[in-house]
């Protein structure tokens, strides 16, 4: 049996998906994609480029599923730890409902994921990435780095007179 999380994910059949997620994690910027597009010469090149870029699109719910499998946590436990209603959490994980930035941040804390993974999740959810110059975001980043719980992060936010992660 493979020993690293990455190898285990590949072993259980997540190879293609893992590669797509890695492409997102490598953060192909709009500028890079635009540069590639400008360099195309022929219609056939455009067709190939469109096929390659559309196949690299990962949805929020697919990424959440990937993170869930990577973490080894159960969806119900993540929802509980994130203080997200089980039905609403299930809908987010299935892709039938969207989530606010704060809800995604609570899920990130419950999943114990990295700042980088959190920012990818936020971008896929149509939200702004965490920005360390913002007090609120800096506290959340600290919580992510130190695997703090949602109540712990809320306490830190409260101590600094900032809005809480929970509505």
Q: Model features per residue range: what roles?
A:
Residues 5-6, 16-17, 22-27, 31-34, ...:
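Short, charged recognition helix plus adjacent turn
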Residues 68, 79, 108:
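The alpha-helix within a helix-turn-helix
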Residues 74-81:
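Short alpha-helical "recognition helix" segments of helix-turn-helix
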Residues 76, 87, 116:
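Key DNA-contact positions within bacterial/archaeal DNA-binding proteins
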Residues 83-99, 124-126:
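Recognition helix of helix-turn-helix/homeodomain-like DNA-binding domains
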